[in-house]
A protein has these predicted regions:
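Conserved "HGTGT" condensation-loop signature of ketosynthase/thiolase-family condensing enzymes
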Residues: 1-181
Length: 181
């Protein structure tokens, strides 16, 4: 197993490891704008409606693919797998959905909030944008998240039909994405 590229985002910085990029940013909307079209090749459908973890996941994957020199294009499919994890699952999205449900008299909540109540939704949004057709898996671990998710991704590389897997650990404080081959 080899790490071909790494993209990362903290609360005010982003970067790529192999290309030795490290820059500041103000917010995710401005980061999204400044990465187009060099790193984010074409607009991400519904990006402004994404929850925070979906934005972090998608942008970090773009950074990691750029770092790994893997190109993607609109409509182009690639057999690349996607494994994701984080420390809270979809807790923030579930809380936002429930608050919206309460605010609407316990009868309705907005559907655009519901989709992100599943912890695999950020991965699915990214897979759609980048045309990834390999296996998609969300993992939840109580301890050793980095080590256990890396072990799982490596095991998948050994037995799956894909030669490349993207591993994302998405958290609001720090998101790191690695392209494994």
């Amino acid at each position: 197993m080899m790490i071909k590229g790494t993209g990362w985002i903290t609360q005010d910085k982003y970067g790529c490891q192999k290309k030795k990029i490290q820059q500041n940013f103000a917010d995710l909307k401005s980061l999204y704008s400044c990465l187009q079209p060099k790193i984010i090749k074409y607009p991400i459908a519904n990006f402004l409606r994404f929850d925070t973890l979906s934005k972090l996941t998608t942008i970090s994957i773009a950074l990691a693919l750029f770092d790994a020199k893997i190109t993607y294009a609109q409509g182009k499919k690639q057999n690349i797998g996607l494994v994701g994890t984080n420390s809270n699952g979809a807790l923030e999205a579930n809380l936002a959905f429930f608050d919206d449900y309460i605010a609407n008299g316990r009868t309705l909540a907005r559907g655009n909030l519901f989709i992100y109540t599943l912890p695999s939704s950020p991965l699915a949004e990214a897979a759609i944008h980048f045309g990834l057709t390999g296996k998609l898996l969300y993992l939840g671990f109580e301890e050793n998240i980095e080590r256990e998710s890396l072990k799982c991704a490596c095991d998948m590389l050994k037995v799956e039909s894909t030669k490349t897997i993207i591993l994302v650990n998405a958290n609001p404080q720090k998101t790191i994405c690695r392209v494994l081959h």
